[in-house]
């Protein structure tokens, strides 16, 4: 245990500061495809009963018109966020007409690419820019990849907590800069150790044969409609899931916020020949926002992002530059097909202990060799993480995944105990103990459980996904919202539709000029 980690633990364990751990926030975003009762992609428009995908703050769409995204408010206790996520699911299930919410990260059977509907947000300039951006994603990466669903975990520690640590360490940075650099340090540690999350929580070892559509692969055949890898944990996070050759060389540095932002800012200004050959319009219609390596910063696929709540029309890099890092967004978590919400409370409690460990522990700066090592460890774990005796690389030396994982859990125990002391219970320690059992017995991991379920039944990914989707729908529909809860979501939906209509009615100016202005708003020099 590093001296820095020990000092910070002692500081936060002090009675004068312990309550600061209560003041951070957690939020969850869960993506899920709408499917019909046979488990095929639902091709109809976003249900009106769910409100406007553009302006409803809790129910929107991601890439496709068929890919719902449920968003909780940021709460001090993740248990509260999960309760809110549960209410969103119950409302949505009650409004879906002969449709289900897909239970897996990897997609159901998809139609031909041309028939996968791109999300539509209306005719306002903001709505159209979101739609055109998604048209660009289709051209660049294909629609099937964009139908993969994940779960995003938003995490922050309070500004007062960062201020107390800063003062104890006599940092000369201002509060905003210290907080931002501390979150960047958290991200470096997360990237060192995120392979552990893939082993413990990866839940996509198999996929539909239709997903690859003729692409070369190294997967094995389980049945006519199912491909898999026997030791895989998360094919979603492998090169078979989110992957793109154009982004292969883009690896923003995480040694400080400014270098990270400069890297992304260059990428959204850097022309890319293959995209230039496509152009931005076809038959007079916009087909992508620009021909640069990234249309916008969020096009960069990352397992974790530094974030700041943005104002309407503001670019992410502008918000980070102006106001610093506010929270981080963990993006590598698979949907847990055995959990109706896609994530459980014990998993969330472990994530809190893991992320607090990443925030408090020493986080050395990284170089190219470190980045290659952590990228390879992650890639190896998602494809063969349960292989007995699997070796990873730690500072140039081989180490067994199981041994390293158990060592990490011993270190994370300290943050789990700190969080439990603050709550006066043992939920974090219990969650950590459950993860230790998975390291001792790979058969307890979600990925192993998925394969065991497939092997024990009809060996069909699609049928397994459909069974789980039906079971989850029954679970939610058996517990309808009360009148007050239902009124809240009904009002949210109606208000969001009115807001979108007002935006469309009152907007002015030309969309072409709007896009041009948006593209030019990435600063040449940041934070000067």
From Swiss-Prot:
In its UniProt entry, what is this protein called? Glutamate--cysteine ligase
Name a GO molecular-function annotation. Answer: metal ion binding
Q: Which family does it belong to?
A: Belongs to the glutamate--cysteine ligase type 1 family. Type 1 subfamily.
Q: Which EC number(s) does UniProt give?
A: 6.3.2.2
Organism lineage string: Bacteria, Pseudomonadati, Pseudomonadota, Betaproteobacteria, Burkholderiales
- The top EC class, named as a word, is ligase
- What reaction gets catalysed by this protein? L-cysteine + L-glutamate + ATP = gamma-L-glutamyl-L-cysteine + ADP + phosphate + H(+)
Q: Which InterPro entries match?
A: Gln_synth/guanido_kin_cat_dom (IPR014746), Glu_cys_ligase (IPR007370), Glut_cys_ligase (IPR006334)
Give the organism the record lists.
Janthinobacterium sp. (strain Marseille)
What the entry lists under Pfam families is as follows: Glu_cys_ligase (PF04262)
Alphabetically sorted, this entry's keywords are: ATP-binding, Glutathione biosynthesis, Ligase, Nucleotide-binding
